[in-house]
A protein has these predicted regions:
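N-terminal targeting leaders
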Residues: 2-11, 25-215
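Bacterial N-terminal signal peptides
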Residues: 13-24
Length: 215
């Protein structure tokens, strides 16, 4: 059975692969390297390569629908997707815009759940954006280098100081640790978790091995 040290090495390798992917993306050879790195990262996740690919398709289709409906919606909202579970967060000025965004999020094949965390507000401007960017960067780093967290199975996003968590936890202890790490990041106001356990029946059976579409 793999040890924690092995898992930690795999997570760090996945993180380095993401960094190499970003650096290599500007060259023709980088396309090949990037594809291999992406596949390596996806293979390390609970959802597997197929699950990650399905989620990527869902993301593209929702973003396309938002842009087509109203570009303002696209730039105001955030998407987190894991195994077909879609979390929509951000701020829009009216309820009608929020309703349309959620409706569009349900449309792609493979979407199994849409979690609506949209706030009706004009938004906080550049200060909130800068603060959220710092929170996201700090939280990503803290999770990546924590030896007791399989960070690759989590999606995190800060909106106006609120951190939203999505993904799959190995157990309750790991999720509690992720929650504490997020809460302790400077300027985080609250943490909202939509993470499910590895053995949760809502998960797709064998997501990395050709289960139901939805990733």
């Amino acid at each position: 059975m793999p040890t924690k040290a092995v898992f930690r090495t795999a997570r760090l390798g996945a993180g380095l692969a993401v960094g190499l992917l970003a650096l290599a993306a500007c060259t023709p050879a980088g396309v090949v390297v990037g594809g291999a790195a992406s596949a390596g990262v996806a293979a390390s996740e609970e959802r597997g390569i197929k699950g990650a690919a399905d989620d990527a398709v869902i993301r593209v289709k929702i973003n396309e629908a938002w842009v087509k409906e109203d570009f303002d919606t696209f730039i105001r909202l955030n998407l987190q997707i894991y195994e077909g579970r879609v979390l929509v967060s951000g701020r829009v000025p009216d309820q009608a815009q929020a309703d349309k965004a959620v409706q569009a999020a349900w449309q792609p094949d493979g979407v199994r759940e849409v979690i609506n965390e949209i706030e009706i507000s004009e938004g906080g401007g550049l200060n909130d954006f800068a603060n959220d960017t710092l929170i996201n960067a700090r939280l990503d780093a803290d999770l990546l280098f924590d030896g007791d967290v399989d960070s690759i199975n989590y999606s995190t996003r800060a909106v106006a100081g609120t951190v939203y968590l999505l993904g799959v936890a190995q157990d309750r202890a790991e999720l509690d640790r992720v929650f504490r790490i997020a809460r302790d990041v400077p300027n985080v106001k609250r943490v909202i978790s939509h993470v499910i356990m590895k053995d949760d029946p809502r998960r797709i059976a064998n997501p990395g091995n050709g289960g139901n579409s939805g990733g």
